[in-house]
From Swiss-Prot:
Any GO BP: cell division
PROSITE patterns: CLPX_ZB (PS51902)
Alphabetic keyword roster: ATP-binding, Chaperone, Metal-binding, Nucleotide-binding, Zinc
SMART domains referenced in this protein's UniProt entry, alphabetically: AAA, ClpB_D2-small, zf-C4_ClpX
InterPro entries named in the record: AAA+_ATPase, ATP-dep_Clp_protease_ClpX, ATPase_AAA_core, Clp_ATPase_C, Clp_protease_ATP-bd_su_ClpX, ClpX_bact, P-loop_NTPase, Znf_CppX_C4
Domain ClpX-type ZB: residue ranges: 5-58
A matching Pfam family: zf-C4_ClpX
Binding site for Zn(2+): 17, 20, 39, 42
GO cellular component: HslUV protease complex
Residue positions binding ATP: 121-128
Family membership: Belongs to the ClpX chaperone family.
Name by which UniProt lists this protein: ATP-dependent Clp protease ATP-binding subunit ClpX
Length: 424
């Protein structure tokens, strides 16, 4: 390439695009590299090629929607129990992304979106199910807490911030964000406070339900490119929420009494006794859930109508919690064993220890969510001491350790010396 001369018509000193061969006088801009030049027209052509490749790869991914059986199989690897809920979710998610894969094809029938409502007690796996689903489909996924949401204009988190978080999870790729999954937790906390009209505005209850209606049904949300507050001179990213799958979850405390009253199966007093004595009764009652029960609970009809797929989850009993501790691919016991393995120490749990941990979670009514905190409390002293101890090859946790009546058993490599097993 030659330099531009001061003289007017010397073609030897004119710069040319290294790709298309056009001179600097035939294009608007010529960008110089270390040894090459590229014009603005070639840059635009390259961008068009990249966009087409992105579209074609997206079409391929849409056609590769896993079957309900495949989704269920992966859920079984990570989530223990909840067979009915997993079947409902597998079919709903498969149909949703199958709908996206074929919506561009000519069809007289428009397939509506089916958002999902998960109803189940605390710690039964609602959030974990949604997270696992997003991992299976490989789409952007975010969690939002309904208790922090308020109507636009009030102190609190705006509903449109949900879309902003999803866009951030997709690295500001609008196309990917528009096919993502949003999980809204604690949705039962935005129920209408009472059936009676009030002179004060319910900005965190019914008002939030009204605000969520638009984005759940499908609207074009204007989101600031890098977050922050909106102002008139700012350019916005337009995100269409029509194809975003919304999954709402909540414990719905007290909903079982509404369902029981509708069925006239028990008296109010007897129903309360059953709830306190037999926790599994709650999960069984939830199986009889009807939309009218959600209306009585405090959800508005329009909001319930946006959640046509309802999956109910059961309480986790001791046996299920023991399975959760040991069987999934990322089970808690396996996680702590991996931590101890980094210190070249084998961590062993006796069967009675696992059942004692599960019993504590049932007593505390925290479900699977409380298992980690119980494990942390049991292993805290051991994890504190272990890095400074020499020769320990095995740590054994028994049921007495969980109950607090004994310390973990330390087995040393050279001498079969034991530290622990001493009354606390």
């Amino acid at each position: 390439m030659s330099k531009v001369s001061n003289g007017g018509g010397d073609s030897k000193n004119t710069l040319y695009c290294s790709f298309c061969g056009k001179s600097q006088h035939e294009v608007r801009k010529l960008i110089a590299g270390p040894t090459v030049f590229i014009c603005d027209e070639c840059v635009e052509l390259c961008m068009d090629i990249i966009r087409e490749e992105n579209k074609s790869s997206m079409v391929k991914s849409r056609e590769g929607v896993p079957t309900p059986q495949e989704i269920m199989a992966v859920l079984d690897d990570y989530v223990i129990g909840q067979k009915d809920a997993k079947r409902v979710l597998s079919v709903a998610v498969h149909n949703h992304y199958k709908r996206l894969a074929h919506q561009s094809k000519n069809s007289d029938i428009e397939l509506a979106k089916s958002n999902i409502l998960l109803v189940g007690p605390t710690g039964c796996g609602k959030t974990y199910l949604a997270q696992t689903l997003a991992r299976i489909i490989d789409v952007p996924f975010i969690m939002a807490d309904a208790t922090t949401l308020t109507e636009a204009g009030y102190v609190g988190e705006d509903v449109e911030n949900i879309i902003l978080k999803l866009l951030q999870a997709a690295d500001y790729n609008v196309e990917r964000a528009q096919r993502g999954i949003v999980y809204i937790d604690e949705v039962d906390k935005i129920s209408r406070k009472s059936d009676n009209p009030s002179i004060t505005r319910d900005v965190s209850g019914e008002g939030v339900q009204q605000a969520l209606l638009k984005i759940m049904e499908g609207t074009v949300a204007s989101v600031p490119p890098q977050g922050g507050r909106k102002h008139p001179q700012q350019e916005f990213l337009q995100v269409d929420t029509t194809n975003i799958l919304f999954i709402c979850g909540g414990a719905f405390a007290g909903l079982d009494r509404i369902i029981s009253a509708r069925g006239e199966k028990t008296s109010i007093g007897f129903g309360a006794t059953v709830k306190s004595v037999d926790e599994r009764r709650i999960g069984e009652v939830f199986k009889e859930l009807e939309p009218e029960d959600l209306l009585k609970f405090g959800l508005i009809p329009e909001f319930v109508g946006r959640l046509p797929v309802i999956a109910t989850l059961e309480d986790l009993d001791v046996d299920a919690l023991v399975q959760i501790l040991t069987e999934p691919k990322n089970a808690l016991v396996k996680q702590y064993q991996r931590l101890f393995d980094m210190e070249n120490v084998e961590l062993v749990f006796h069967d009675d220890a696992l059942r004692a941990i599960a019993n504590k979670a049932v007593e505390h009514k925290t479900g699977a969510r409380g298992l980690r905190s119980i494990m942390e409390k049991i292993l805290l002293d051991t994890m504190f001491e272990l890095p400074t101890l020499e020769g320990v090859r095995e740590v054994v946790i028994s049921g007495d350790v969980v109950d607090g009546s004994a310390r973990p058993l330390y087995i040393y490599a050279e001498r079969q010396d034991e530290k622990g097993n001493v009354s606390a």
